[in-house]
Every structure is written in structure tokens, then in C-alpha cells.
Design a protein with these regions (language model features):
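Hydrophobic beta-strand scaffold residues
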Residues: 42, 133-134, 162, 192, ...
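ATP-dependent carboxylate activation and anion-phosphoryl transfer catalytic cores
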Residues: 2-8, 17, 37, 159, ...
Length: 405
């Protein structure tokens, strides 16, 4: 970098109104440490559990979160402005007086919120309004991948194998639970998995071996989402995961991992509580002990799934596999994987610093591509309406009144 080259300011947004709030703090801490300080200025942007936004140097130290983080000296409240002229954060905003507040410009935003209000397309929509380049999948891909029910339907259309399942709403369950249970019994054989449609990190998920335990599992899942998915449990299968990096047809698949679980499925505790590094510290076998032909097939399914949702950036695609039979089922696509799947990319020859750098480049490429799309269409409709005195609208109203008469 030359003396005249300005470093890129990256806002890393994390925390959030999500059941995966704490997981997000760990992931963001790893992301912020990965940036090359010679190339990037990192701005931590913390979203509290009640939805307030903050920035400040104390947010860079994960030890500060052991106490009330927002009470630390040097923390300022901010809002991410949707107005394109701000291109970043309004610091210490006063209602109705943004012009007197400091504007902290962000060149790129790096979303690191897992699950609701961050990984589901909502934060991405805000960034689209603000016209700020951002890392990762866009609104549509984020929303589709985050919803297990919608993703399953899309992947099925693309001939990517998924596990059989049924879905229903919380209203269906509360209205007639016996009918829902009868439908499950008609459609699926036990054991089954009961899942909220949109949560991650195994939160709200239960494995049910008989109908007697089904009601309690559905109650738990319905507590975390208004829609519930029930899937056949793949007995004798192993979990195998693959990360994807890139956009469009320029995609790369990582080596495979096989998480080591001591439970019937990989629980929240196994993913995060066994170490301070989140998914990075979970037990796993890399590369997964899968034969080369099956490995290539899993990697190809991961790439196809990422293209199907129109993904960009990086994601971790999770599979259930029966290696001895060559059977594969895609379980889910994580567009904001825990620890950003650093461990998979490291084993694939990409360092954490190089990964975040590549993701920033992809974000800027996507933003440049967006600028090729026209969002303005000039017409004379306003002039015509002004000339007519909006008589057309009044006439329509009169027509309605006459029809009612």
C-alpha cells in the first residue's frame, strides 16, 4: 500500500436480537482479529439484545463482555443510517438533529450476526437501502437459506437430495395439535427431528424417538419460531460439512470436515461450550474420512446449492451422509457459519486474513455490479396528474361511491 492509499474502514456488526447473540460475539471477535491492520481499520458495531447499536474500542476485547459492555468508557450509541448520503453510522444521534451528530463513514460492512435480524436478510436489506457494500449473501439468498422450509423446497427443485419432512405453523399447532400429530405419524417414521424453521446453533431442535415425546418437542420449537419443521432422522449417518467461497460461477469448495459428537446430534453445548473459540474449538476430523469419489460429490452438491440460492461470499453447507451406501442428504446452508468456517479454509490453504480480504473484495464486486442496474425510470405521470388536478383519482372515488349506491 502506498503512502497515499487510504485504508479500508470495515464495520463489523454483531450481537443482535437473536438467540445466537453470544455466538455472534465470538464469531465477530475472530473476524476482527483476522484483518490485516496495514490494510483495514476495523470498527466494531455491537447490537444489544434489545436492539440498541453501539461502537467503541472496548468492543474489540471479548473479555469486556463479561460485564455490562455498554457501560464501559468509550462506548457510544449509534444508528446505521439508511440515507445514502451518510454511508455509515450516526454517532450519538439526537432525534431530528442528525446534522449536528458525527457521521462515521464505513466503506464496507461485515455482518456477523447469526440467525434472526442478521442472517435472515433483514440486516442485508438495511444495507441495501444505505447503499453500503457488505460481505456475504444478499437479501434473497440470506432469507432463503435461513428458512429451512423454504430452502428445502428450493433445493428439491434443483435435484439436490434433502431429508423427507413436513412443516406447519404455530397457529396450526395451537389450533389442532392432534391433527398435526396425526399428519406426522402418517407421513414419517420415528425417530424424527423437530426444528424451528429459522434458528441455528441447534437451538430449539429436538430428536424424538416416539409419539409420546412429540408434543413437548413441538412446544419447544414453536417457542422459537412461528413455523416448525419435522424431519425423518437419518439413523446411522454422519454429519459432513463443506464450506463454499465465491460468487456466481466462480466458486470454490473447501475440504470436508466430520464433526465428532458424543450426543445423538451436534448440540449447542458441543458446538460452543467446550472451548472459547466457538465452532473453531469443536472436535472434528479434517479432512473427513470419506472416499475421494463421495467427497467430490458432496463438494459438487455444496456448490450447486450455493448457486441455487444465488449466494455470494462464504457459507458452510451441512450434510448427512451414509458413506458405506454412498447416500447424501443436504441438511442446511449456513450463510453466516460459526467462526466463519476459518478452520475449513485454513485446511484448504486460505488463511483467516486472506479469507476476510477475499470477502471484502467480493462485497465490493457485488456493489459495483449493483450499480450497473438502473433504479430510475423517468415519466411524465406527475406532470399529467398536476395538469388534471388529480381528477382521475376523484373520479375513481366517485365511481366507487356510485357502485356502492
Amino acid at each position: 500500500m502506498t503512502a497515499t492509499t487510504r485504508k479500508t474502514t470495515v464495520g463489523v456488526v454483531f450481537g443482535g436480537r437473536s438467540v445466537e447473540h453470544d455466538v455472534s460475539i465470538i464469531t465477530a471477535n475472530q473476524i476482527m482479529r483476522a484483518f490485516d491492520p496495514a490494510l483495514y481499520d476495523v470498527v466494531p458495531v455491537y447490537v444489544s439484545r434489545d436492539g440498541r447499536w453501539y461502537t467503541g474500542a472496548p468492543l474489540l476485547d471479548i473479555k469486556n463482555y463479561e460485564s455490562e459492555i455498554v457501560s464501559h468508557k468509550g462506548i457510544a450509541q449509534v444508528v446505521l443510517s439508511p440515507a445514502v448520503q451518510h454511508h455509515g453510522l450516526i454517532v450519538n444521534p439526537v432525534s431530528g438533529r442528525f446534522s449536528r451528530s458525527e457521521v462515521l463513514r464505513l466503506d464496507v460492512v461485515f455482518p456477523a450476526i447469526h440467525g434472526t435480524h442478521g442472517e435472515d436478510g433483514t440486516l442485508q436489506g438495511l444495507l441495501e437501502l444505505a447503499d453500503i457494500p457488505y460481505v456475504g449473501c444478499g437479501v434473497l439468498a440470506s432469507a432463503v437459506a435461513n428458512d429451512k422450509i423454504t430452502a428445502k423446497a428450493l433445493l428439491n427443485q434443483h435435484s439436490i437430495p434433502v431429508i423427507e419432512g413436513i412443516s406447519f405453523s404455530r397457529a396450526d399447532w395451537l389450533g389442532d395439535p392432534d391433527a398435526v400429530i396425526a399428519r406426522i405419524e402418517r407421513t414419517l417414521a420415528f425417530p424424527v427431528f423437530v426444528k424451528p424453521a429459522t434458528t441455528g446453533s441447534s437451538i430449539g431442535i429436538g430428536r424424538v424417538s416416539d409419539v409420546g415425546l412429540l408434543r413437548a418437542a413441538i412446544d419447544i420449537a414453536a417457542h422459537f419460531d412461528r413455523r416448525v419443521l419435522v424431519e425423518r432422522a437419518v439413523t446411522g449417518g454422519v454429519e459432513v460439512n463443506c464450506a463454499v467461497l465465491g460468487s456466481g460461477n466462480d466458486l470454490r469448495a473447501s475440504v470436508l470436515e466430520q464433526p465428532v459428537s458424543w450426543e445423538e446430534f451436534l448440540t449447542y453445548d458441543e458446538k460452543y461450550r467446550r472451548g472459547s473459540e466457538g465452532m473453531k474449538s469443536a472436535e472434528r476430523i479434517i479432512p473427513a474420512p470419506i472416499d475421494p469419489a463421495l467427497t467430490a460429490k458432496i463438494q459438487e452438491y455444496a456448490l450447486r446449492a450455493f448457486r441455487a440460492i444465488d449466494g455470494r461470499g462464504t457459507a458452510r453447507v451441512d450434510f448427512l451422509v451414509k458413506p458405506e451406501k454412498g447416500e447424501i442428504w443436504l441438511n442446511e446452508i449456513n450463510t453466516m457459519p460459526g467462526s466463519l468456517a476459518f478452520y475449513l479454509w485454513q485446511e484448504s490453504g486460505i488463511s483467516a486474513a486472506e479469507l476476510v480480504h477475499q470477502l471484502i473484495l467480493l462485497a465490493r464486486e457485488a456493489h459495483a455490479e449493483k450499480r450497473r442496474t438502473s433504479f430510475d425510470y423517468q415519466t411524465d405521470l406527475i406532470a399529467l396528474a398536476a395538469m388534471r388536478g388529480l381528477k382521475g383519482v376523484k373520479g375513481a372515488k366517485g365511481g366507487v361511491e356510485k357502485a356502492r349506491a
